[in-house]
A protein has these predicted regions:
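Conserved loop->alpha-helix
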Residues: 1-217
Length: 217
């Protein structure tokens, strides 16, 4: 589990794609502290397993599903990435619950300055957008941010100077892809409400869990 508080900006050494999967090598320092092979590091919000460690970096396998759902496939040598180690059991919880299993990507629509903050507007799919709520949490490229506004096609967040300096978000341009993970609690609530709705529909039809168990299902 992660918190969405980026520990450092790393730099992609290379990404080797073989078919739909590959190997990602990242130059880093801070996230190597205490890290062992098999540990998890979030790279732009994507949970990856460390497969080898060097004095100034690490490598990780990137699966086909990760390439399909994320923007990691578009990384190249020199690309800056946000890095965070999985949270220790006694670690400080600074952001929100982040699984590192992203839901998809969004496209930056615009970036506008207002005094000391930057408004970042992101367009995304209806499947992701319907779980994004104003004043709720969203993880963008591994960064825990608060949703300020939601519209029919996307949403906006306000990025403070510290977040801009410590992450890669403000280095991006309109049209660039970002990885998105919806609030995990919201996803569980939606799932439970869906189950309850299905149960109510089954009761109306006379088919309940008790009915199915009674007849051996």
């Amino acid at each position: 589990m992660f918190t969405g508080i980026v520990e450092e900006k790393g730099k992609v050494r290379y990404i080797q794609l073989t078919g739909e999967s590959g190997i990602l090598a990242v130059k880093a320092r801070k996230v190597l502290e205490g890290t062992r092979i098999g540990d998890s590091i979030a790279v732009n919000g994507v949970c990856l397993t460390v497969t080898s460690i060097q004095p100034d970096g690490f490598t990780a396998d990137v699966m086909a599903e990760t390439i399909r759902r994320s923007s990691l496939g578009s990384c190249k040598a020199g690309s800056q990435v946000n890095l965070e180690r999985a949270m220790a059991a006694d670690g400080r919880f600074g952001g929100h619950i982040v699984s590192g299993h992203i839901d998809g990507t969004g496209v930056i629509r615009s970036m506008l300055r207002e005094e000391n903050a930057i408004w970042v507007s992101i367009e995304t799919s209806p499947q992701i957008l319907h779980l994004i709520v104003e004043k709720g949490s969203v993880c963008i490229d591994g960064i825990s941010l608060t949703v300020a506004r939601v519209d029919e096609a996307g949403f906006q967040v306000s990025v403070i100077p510290h977040t801009g300096e410590e992450t890669t978000l403000l280095e991006k341009m309109p049209g660039d892809l970002v990885n998105l993970e919806n609030d995990l609690i919201g996803k569980y609530v939606e799932k439970l409400l869906g189950i309850r709705k299905n149960e109510e529909e089954k009761k109306e039809s006379g088919i309940t869990m008790e009915f199915l168990e009674e007849f051996g299902f």
